[in-house]
């Protein structure tokens, strides 16, 4: 699977990475780079050139979004503990336009994940993360995140290589 990401900028990226790394270590789960998934790229990567052209000319980046909540819920292994962010007009326009350009599926609500419920070693989903445990982790994360807004930019195309759940195989293949 291939997707387009926006990344937090500067200090925010460093703080979120430290938080993700620490909670992954504490919970025996995989660590990953902080990002907001703009959309998937479902087919031919030739559309990435058109996406890059849009990014260059749109004038929307970086986008500043408000944090609305830090949530823990059993949704998918990739949406277990996450920062919900405001779907501002700028973010919505950016995501929808890129979705149209690359032919992606309908978008899910914008968020920045903090914990995936994938085992650190096997990368298999961990059934021991119930709603209560995820809510407790989310509350701890919320206590450590002072920022009320996040600045997102530096778009890139990420490729999952060996499959979506092969988090260690994820690689940035192109900056937009």
Can you annotate each of these PLM segments?
Residues 1-68, 84-146, 151, 163-176:
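Basic, often amphipathic N-terminal segments
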Residues 72-81:
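Short, basic/glycine-rich phosphate-binding loops at helix/coil junctions
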Residues 156-158:
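Active-site-proximal alpha-helix that buttresses catalytic centers in soluble enzyme cores
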């Amino acid at each position: 699977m291939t997707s387009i990401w926006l990344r937090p900028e500067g200090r925010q990226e460093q703080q979120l990475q430290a938080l993700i790394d620490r909670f992954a270590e504490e919970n025996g789960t995989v660590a990953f780079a902080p990002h907001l998934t703009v959309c998937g790229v479902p087919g031919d990567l030739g559309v990435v050139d058109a996406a890059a052209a849009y990014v260059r000319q749109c004038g929307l980046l970086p986008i500043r979004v408000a944090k609305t909540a830090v949530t823990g819920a059993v949704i998918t292994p990739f949406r277990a503990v996450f920062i919900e962010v405001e779907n501002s007009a700028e973010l919505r326009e950016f995501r929808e336009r890129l979705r149209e350009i690359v032919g992606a599926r309908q978008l899910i609500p914008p968020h920045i994940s903090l914990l995936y419920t994938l085992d650190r070693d096997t990368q298999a989903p961990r059934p021991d993360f119930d709603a209560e445990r995820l809510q407790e982790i989310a509350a701890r994360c919320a206590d450590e995140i002072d920022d009320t807004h996040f600045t997102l930019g530096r778009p890139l195309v990420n490729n999952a290589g060996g499959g979506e759940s092969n988090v260690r195989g994820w690689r940035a293949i192109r900056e937009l």
